[in-house]
Amino acid sequence: PAKPKLKNRTALYKEMGNGYTYLGFNLKREPFNDKKVRQAINYAINKDEVIKGVLLGLGEPISSPYKPGTRWSDPSLKPYEYSTKKALNLLKEAGYKMSDDNFLVKDGKALEFEIITNQNKQREMTAVLIQRRLKEIGIKVSIRVIEWASFVNRFIKPGDFDVVVLGWSLSLDPDQFNIWHSSQQGPGQFNFVGYDNKKVDQLLEKGRRELDLDK
């Protein structure tokens, strides 16, 4: 029980943490090298459902790898809404059609992939919710949960994966060169999803030289 002297002098505050959970595509593999497929999957995931079911409501969707409300984040960017209609339209544009057994197919091949994650209950639950939502629009998803050392050495380092559910913690330093620069894709480096964008490379390099915080 609270001490009488403190009972009326305390207040509880909620503050968003510096970590986030993400779905990471292997951009060097089909069909994840197709932007429309990635966008469709984003639309098909009910992020509010994940936040309520996994985080007990203590979280919010984000639209970039920067914490909302910080000087590094862009308030004009909005998270993808949950819309199966938009997801299916994008997949249709990408060449997929619904088969008789209600799965998406392109050139005779079903749209299916494996999500891998480490032994973390929140990430396992997140993967299951994603799997259910993607099944609703005709995407086959399997889940594999792997011990961390095997996860890194057998799958991440050699790039032998389709999709991962992982988490990342942000530091006070906004520099994310090691995560997103195209030069950081080697074994043991952090850009293991294979993100490669020349404009982003230039901005990351410029950011490392910039001393003006407002820029």
What do the predicted segments below correspond to?
Residues 19-23, 64, 191:
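Small-molecule pocket liners
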Residues 12-13, 32-132, 196:
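Append "and occasionally in soluble cytosolic enzymes with long acidic Gly/Pro-rich linkers
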Residues 4, 27-29, 44-49, 54-58, ...:
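Sec/Tat-exported extracytoplasmic proteins
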Residues 7, 17-20, 61, 110, ...:
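Extracytoplasmic
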Residues 1, 97-170, 213:
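Ligand/substrate-recognition segments at binding pockets and active sites
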